[in-house]
Curated annotation (Swiss-Prot):
GO terms for molecular function: DNA-binding transcription factor activity; transcription cis-regulatory region binding; zinc ion binding. Belongs to the Fur family. This is Ferric uptake regulation protein. InterPro entries: FUR, Fur_C, WH-like_DNA-bd_sf, WH_DNA-bd_sf.
Amino acid sequence: MSDNNQALKDAGLKVTLPRLKILEVLQQPECQHISAEELYKKLIDLGEEIGLATVYRVLNQFDDAGIVTRHHFEGGKSVFELSTQHHHDHLVCLDCGEVIEFSDDVIEQRQKEIAAKYNVQLTNHSLYLYGKCGSDGSCKDNPNAHKPKK
């Protein structure tokens, strides 16, 4: 039995072809932070006949089962990424829409200190930073615009 079959069963979901195909697409590195519509188009490009309503339904089921995490970035539409064991935060460029994942121990520690100051035990958190490209919006045409500086 494939790993994806087992992952669906472990999440309490029946193994179906649409669920398997959607999970396969979500596992592709270029499909992080993908909307339902983008995922649907990707499935069409791959020759899969899965309707948009099914894509929405499966993504909601995956979200409920903890297979994916739903994010609501600027712009109003939900995007999805596979749930991971490691925590990370997001930096979103308002010019091109690129979403950059990052982890920073100093930020994590500071959040814990703030919670402790107010006598709150953190159970979860998410941090979204929004900004505009430092290169006057030219990031839309430059695939390297958001590479980390050395």
